[in-house]
Amino acid sequence: MKKTPFITLEKAKEIKAQIPTPFHVYDEAGIRANARALKAAFSWNKGFREYFAVKATPNPFILQILKEEGCGCDCASYTELLMAQAVGNTGHDVMFSSNVTPEKDMRKAYEMGAYINLDDSTHVEFLSRICDGKVPETVCLRYNPGGSFSLGNTIMDMPRDAKYGMTEDQMAGAINRLQKLGTKHFGIHAFLASNTTANGYYPELASQLFRLAVRLRNATGCHFAFINLSGGVGVDYRPEQPASNIALIGEGVRQKYEQILTPQGMDDIAIFTELGRFMLAPYGHLISTVLHQKHIYREYVGLDACAADLMRPAMYGAYHHITVLGKEDAILDHVYDVTGGLCENNDKFAIERSLPQIEIGDIVAIHDTGAHGYSMGYNYNGKLRSAEVLLKEDSSFQLIRRAEKPSDYFATFDFTDFHFGG
C-alpha cells in the first residue's frame, strides 16, 4: 500500500520559511482520530483507558491533545512524571512502571497518587519504606511468564530473556504481602512483544493475563481492578506491511474477556493499554532538506537531518519510508543511500533505496517518526536537537518545541569560567 505523507510540499515550505529544517511535524487531526478509534474499539469495557507511553513522544502539547481525548500518561521516570503533572495529569491519570527505580522517582509517583506498577517482588518492601510503612490502596504487578511467547507457530518474543516482571509465584507472594500492608485492589501488567501488526497479539496476551488473574484471585482471594495490556501493537513502517486493525483487536480482547473473566464473576475488571508507537508514530514526519549529493561507488544524498534527529535506522537498522515532497507520483528510477552528517558510517536513513531523482534543495519527509523519533535524539558530534511543530486541525501550524541552540548544549558548564560563542 502506498504511503502518503500528511504534509504537502507547499505546507512544508510555509513552515520552513519560519522554522528551518530539520524539524519533526505532527498531525493533530490524525492523532485525535486514532485516539478515538482506539477508544471505540474498547468501548465495550466500561473502565477502558489508554495510558500513553510518554517516552515515545515526550512533549506537553502532544500530551495535552491526548488528555483531551481521554488518555492518561504511562511514565517511567521522575521527569516523565513532572511532564505528566505539567499538563494536569495526577492521581490515577498516571501509571508509573518501576524498573530499577530510584527512590526519588518512586516517592514522586506515590505523592502524585499514580498507579504504581511494581517490576519485582522485592519492590514491595521498597515501596512500603518509601511510603513510611503505608502502601497505596491499588497496586499493579508486572508479569513475566518466562519461556517464549508465540502466536500459532510463530515465536513473537522471548520473555525468559527480558529483565522485566516477576514470576507467577512471586506475584502471589507479593499480593499476600501487600494485602497484609493494606492494599485492597490489584492490577496486572505485561509486555510480551514489540511492534507487532499481528492482530492476534493483544487477544492472546489478554487470554494469558485473564487466566493468570483467575488463578491469582483463587490463590490469594485478592480483587483485580484492572489488567494492563501495555504496548506492543505496531505500525506498518513499510508500504507492503499490513496495518494493525484496532477494531478487530478490540473485538478479539472482548471475546477473551467474556470467555474467561465473565464466567468467574470478574467482569468488573477494567482494561488499560499503554500504546506509544501505535498512537503517534504514523502521525509524525521528520522534514529535512537535501544539502549535498555525492557520486562514488554509490549515489549518496546528504540531508540536514542526521541520526541525532532519528536514531532508529542507525541503531536498529529500522526502515522508515521516505517521500520527496512534490515528487510523490514520480518514477522511482534512482537508487540512493540517504545520509546525515554524523561522523559515523551508520548515519543512514536509507540504504540503496529506490527514489525519484533528487536534487539539492529538495525537501523530504521521513515517515513514522511520531514515536521514538525526537525522543531518542542526542547531541553526539555536537549536533543540536531539532524543533517540533504541530500541524493543527485547521491547517495552521504551531511551534511546540524550539530547536536547540549552542547555549543549550553548553548550559551544563554554567558553573565554569569558560565562555562559549554562538
Q: Language-model segments: which ranges?
A:
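A charged N-terminal "starter" segment
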Residues: 1-137, 176, 180, 184, ...
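Conserved, mostly hydrophobic/aromatic
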Residues: 31, 55, 77, 109, ...
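Flexible loop/turn segments at secondary-structure boundaries
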Residues: 58-61, 82-83, 102, 148-149, ...
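Short acidic, glycine/serine/threonine-rich loops at helix termini
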Residues: 63, 86, 106-110, 127-130, ...
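Structured core elements
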Residues: 72, 95, 117, 140-142, ...
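Glycine-rich, aromatic-flanked loop segments that form ligand/cofactor-binding clefts
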Residues: 134-148
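Active-site loop/helix belt of alpha/beta enzymes
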Residues: 145-291, 355
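Charged (often Lys/Glu-rich) extended helix/loop segments that serve as interaction or gating elements
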Residues: 266-422
